[in-house]
UniProtKB/Swiss-Prot annotation:
<dbReference type="Pfam" id="PF01381">
    <property type="entry name" value="HTH_3"/>
</dbReference>
<keyword id="KW-0804">Transcription</keyword>
<dbReference type="Pfam" id="PF00717">
    <property type="entry name" value="Peptidase_S24"/>
</dbReference>
<dbReference type="GO" id="GO:0007165">
    <property type="term" value="P:signal transduction"/>
</dbReference>
<feature type="domain" description="HTH cro/C1-type">
    <location>
        <begin position="15"/>
        <end position="68"/>
    </location>
</feature>
<dbReference type="InterPro" id="IPR001387">
    <property type="entry name" value="Cro/C1-type_HTH"/>
</dbReference>
<dbReference type="InterPro" id="IPR015927">
    <property type="entry name" value="Peptidase_S24_S26A/B/C"/>
</dbReference>
<dbReference type="InterPro" id="IPR000488">
    <property type="entry name" value="Death_dom"/>
</dbReference>
<dbReference type="GO" id="GO:0003677">
    <property type="term" value="F:DNA binding"/>
</dbReference>
<feature type="DNA-binding region" description="H-T-H motif">
    <location>
        <begin position="26"/>
        <end position="45"/>
    </location>
</feature>
<keyword id="KW-0244">Early protein</keyword>
<protein>
    <recommendedName>
        <fullName>Repressor protein C</fullName>
    </recommendedName>
</protein>
<keyword id="KW-0238">DNA-binding</keyword>
<dbReference type="InterPro" id="IPR010982">
    <property type="entry name" value="Lambda_DNA-bd_dom_sf"/>
</dbReference>
<dbReference type="InterPro" id="IPR036286">
    <property type="entry name" value="LexA/Signal_pep-like_sf"/>
</dbReference>
<keyword id="KW-0805">Transcription regulation</keyword>
<keyword id="KW-0678">Repressor</keyword>
Length: 263
């Protein structure tokens, strides 16, 4: 067994054993630590090596804090590293800025004068890495339903193709309705202003059945087939079937431009 796989197995095996000892479900654990069930499932399934709420998880499961940190570090990620958006901003605030001018090299008399000049010195600020919010709380079911209530589940790195796209976001794939195209636990990155084309994978949002009770839009990840005169037509892979919504039901159709566990 690969060393990293062994360490990840130690983490996931310990979490599973402690959860069973505690007599609670992943859903209940997620509720107690203020995380989505998807985020907790990613950790238990080995798709994530750490969590922003690792101390709370250790406390709820009766794991020594130092042991918890050690297992996560062995699995490939030190939980003490800055990973949250607020933490990243705090980290950037203390980065030194190269404000000292570059040293000037004096022209020596015996050397020929250069026939080109160097431009004025500029204050080179460190490039700030953009993060995108992960939206859509998984509901589950055969169709892989989500709820888009505005809650941010996590933050992920922004790919270059979305750096200048306002309101771009990501979604964690849940369920198997789009296997083999997407598998549970993968991340998809979404372009909210690009028109979808036939064959594109998309994130769609649908008005709730009863908007009067203030329910948020429902969402799905499907393949875009097209529009008819009065319907949106989509394709699902597993089980294979066509899905249709009336135009009045549709809130948005956003194409997925990138997918994978890592990019």
């Amino acid at each position: 067994m690969h060393k990293g796989t062994f360490h990840m197995s130690r983490l996931t095996d310990t979490l599973a054993a402690k959860l069973e000892e505690a007599g609670i479900t992943q859903a209940e654990l997620a509720r107690r630590v203020g995380q989505s069930q998807q985020a907790i499932n990613n950790l238990f399934a080995g798709r994530a090596a750490s969590s922003m709420v690792w101390r709370e998880l250790a406390r709820e499961l009766g794991i020594d804090e130092q042991e918890m940190r050690q297992m996560m570090t062995e699995a490939g990620r030190d939980p003490e590293k800055v990973t949250s958006l607020a933490g990243l901003r705090k980290y950037r605030a203390v980065l030194p800025s190269p404000r000292e001018p570059f040293p000037i090299i004096r022209q020596q008399e015996h050397l020929p004068r250069p026939n080109a000049t160097i431009g004025e010195e500029t204050n080179m600020e460190p490039r700030k890495k953009k993060l995108l919010p992960v939206l859509g709380e998984a509901v589950g079911g055969e169709d892989g339903e989500y709820i888009f209530n505005g809650s941010v589940l996590d933050y992920v790195d922004c790919p270059p193709s979305l750096e200048n796209v306002p309101n771009a976001y990501a979604v964690y794939i849940d369920g198997e309705s789009m296997v083999p195209r997407f598998r549970p636990g993968e991340t998809v990155w979404v372009h909210p202003t690009k028109p979808p084309r036939r064959g594109d994978d998309v994130v769609i949002q649908i008005h709730p059945d009863n908007e009067d009770d203030g329910a948020p839009p429902r969402g799905f990840v499907k393949e875009f087939v097209g529009w008819t005169a009065n319907k949106l037509v989509l394709q699902q892979y597993n089980p294979t079937k066509k899905i249709e919504f009336t135009r009045e039901q549709v809130v948005s159709v956003h194409p997925i431009i990138l997918a994978g566990k890592y990019w």
